[in-house]
Structures are given as C-alpha cells and as structure tokens.
C-alpha cells in the first residue's frame, strides 16, 4: 500500500487560541514553582486519575458513580451485579491511564503500535495485545432518534489514514507546533477516523493526555480534562461537529478546525487554572519539611506511598491495583522497595504478607495527621 500524504489540518491561531495558550503557560509555570511536596502530588494525582476515569467512561454512558468508580479502582468493591461491563470499562481506563503516564515519562513516541496498545487495554484490559483496526463500516447514531450523526471513513481506508495521522504528529513535533494544539488535533482526528467499533472516544482522550504528559504539560497528573468535557457534554460534541455533512468523505476530512482548537485550549486553560488554585492551596498549607527518603522516590513509588496516607499496611494486591501490574510484578516491586529501605515487611506470612512504611516516612505521615 502506497503511504498517503501527511495529513494537513486546516486551522488558524485566533486571538482566542493565543489567549488560551498564554493562560495555560502561566498556570503551568505557577504550578511548577508552587513547590508541591511529593506526598501532596501523589494524593492529588490519585484523586485526579479517579475523576478522569469516572468522567471519561461516563461520557460514553458508564453508569457507575464517582464513589463507585473509586471503590472499583481501590479494590474495595469488585462486583456490581448487572453492571459488569461498567466495572470492566472503569478498570480498563484506569489501567490505560496508568500505562500512558509511564510511557510518557519514558518519552515514547506516538506510533500506531502505541495507539493499538492503548485501545487494547481500553477494550480488553491490561493483558490485551494490540487491538486491530475495524474490518467493516461503523456509524454513530443519535441515541434518541436513531438517525446517523456521523459516518466515518470506510475500513479499507483506516490503515492508511492512521499511518498518515501518526506521521503528522511526528512532523508537528519537529515543526514545533505547540504541544497543546497537537493534542487537540490528535484528539479530533482519531475520533474522525474512528478506527474501532468501540472505545474511540476513550482512546482519543487518552492519546491527547499522553501527548500533553509527554510534551511537558502533564502537571504531575493533577489535572482532569475529562471532567470538564463531561460537565458540558453538548459543548464537547458540538465543538467536534465541524463538518457540513455527516459523511467523512463529504466535508469533514477538509473541515476548518479552528473552532475545535478554541474549545480544547479554552477548556484546558480552565483545567490548568483549577489545578493552579489547588496547588497553591496545598503549597500554602504544607509547612512540614519532607524527609530525604521521600524525595528520592520515583513516580511509581510515590504513587504507592500515597496509599499509606489512608492505611497503615498495604498488600501486593493493593500495589497491583494502583499500578496496573500483575501480582507477580507487584511482589517484585515490593521486594525492590524493601531493599531500598523505605518500606518494611510487617507480616512475613507468604499468604497474607503485609508491608508498612519505614520509620522516617511513618513519622512523616503521623506528623501530617496532627
């Protein structure tokens, strides 16, 4: 198959977009300079990921509440009779979000393989392989009338369009197009191609989040863009509805995307401003010096450390859940952390082994509670 030319999205940097980008940069700088302690970052990130998981799946019709979503993610409740699919969607989105944060931290590029891996987790869980593109036509219908809202490109064209799509992202980064605009356009184009029968919206939002994290706009994971999309779902869908016709081949492929970028950057600027306010609140209220042992922890270790803010002991199953790992990999990670000296084995029983914080970090946790 001869590669298609690189996708050339049509848009202009309007005054609104320029102002939004300025607000985003300002909030980003303030959060970076807020001096948030790692413990606060870990807890804020955990809360944001739970909200992101809830609201992104809710957009697609998931029936679990925010509290129920948190129960599924933390393992406090695993079964909701009659809502098994909702539970699986929440679990899978959390796992995918955990993975993209790790991949972004490693600087992995956007490739078709990465996208197919994200989609695989969204659709079938963390042990899934690459998700193949659809092999037939799909349509998006109005949930009330049943009428066709959008008809994506034919399955035959999907591989070529996806190849063109990832090449554009690579070229856009080379051309130093602002990261936020790349994320906005990536979100739009993935949904436009609609390469899967299901999970396109969730995967598109994850791709946009990955690009933001990878490009330095991750804010340590303390923001929730999905929540703001969900607050006004009509505005979200209206902003993406830029074509004059519901058929991909009759206008949407060549649509002007300035309006969508205005929506995306405006929403993100509101999200970043909320994160800035939250960061300042935590920074001003935190006067206790953090121990060196805590500052040396990497991202995964800090995520696990945050568990001790709510419980005295943890088990390998807790680590497996929060980091989207297998039980075996969680035990390996715990063994490494025991050797590093920041956690200790409290109950050596192989069947019910428990871990707690080493003394310096336990004292720090205790000081936060008084």
Give residue ranges: language-model regions.
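FIC/Doc superfamily catalytic core
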Residues: 1-370
């Amino acid at each position: 198959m001869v590669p298609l030319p690189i996708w050339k999205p049509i848009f202009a940097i309007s005054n609104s977009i320029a102002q939004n980008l300025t607000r985003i940069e300002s909030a980003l700088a303030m959060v970076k300079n807020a001096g948030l302690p790692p413990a606060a970052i870990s807890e804020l990130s955990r809360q944001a990921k739970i909200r992101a998981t809830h609201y992104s799946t809710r957009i697609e019709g998931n029936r679990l509440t925010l509290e129920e979503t948190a129960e599924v993610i933390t393992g406090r409740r695993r079964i909701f009779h009659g809502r098994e699919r909702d539970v699986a969607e929440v679990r899978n989105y959390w796992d995918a979000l955990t993975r993209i944060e790790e991949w972004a931290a490693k600087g992995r590029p956007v490739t078709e393989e990465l996208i197919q891996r994200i989609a695989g987790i969204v659709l079938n869980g963390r042990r899934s392989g690459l998700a193949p593109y659809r092999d037939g036509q799909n349509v998006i219908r109005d949930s009330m009338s049943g009428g066709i809202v959008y008809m994506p490109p034919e399955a035959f064209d999907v591989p070529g369009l996806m190849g063109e799509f990832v090449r554009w992202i690579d070229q856009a980064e080379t051309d130093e197009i602002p990261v936020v605009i790349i994320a906005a356009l990536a979100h739009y184009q993935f949904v436009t191609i609609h390469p899967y029968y299901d999970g396109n919206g969730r995967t598109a939002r994850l791709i946009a989040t990955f690009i933001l994290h990878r490009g330095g706009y991750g804010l340590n994971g303390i923001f929730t863009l999905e929540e703001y999309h969900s607050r006004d779902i009509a505005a979200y869908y209206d902003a993406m509805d830029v074509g004059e016709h519901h058929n991909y081949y009759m206008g949407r492929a060549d649509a002007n995307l300035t309006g969508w970028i205005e929506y995306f950057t405006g929403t993100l600027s509101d999200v970043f401003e909320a994160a800035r306010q939250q960061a300042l609140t935590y920074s001003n209220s935190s006067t206790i010096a953090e121990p060196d042992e805590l500052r040396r922890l990497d991202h995964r270790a800090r995520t696990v450390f945050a568990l001790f803010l709510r419980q005295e002991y943890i088990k390998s199953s807790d680590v497996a859940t929060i980091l989207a790992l297998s039980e075996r990999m969680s035990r390996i990670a715990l063994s490494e952390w025991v050797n590093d000296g920041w956690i200790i084995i409290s109950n050596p029983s192989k069947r019910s082994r428990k871990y707690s914080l080493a003394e310096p970090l336990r004292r720090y946790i205790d000081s936060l509670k008084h």
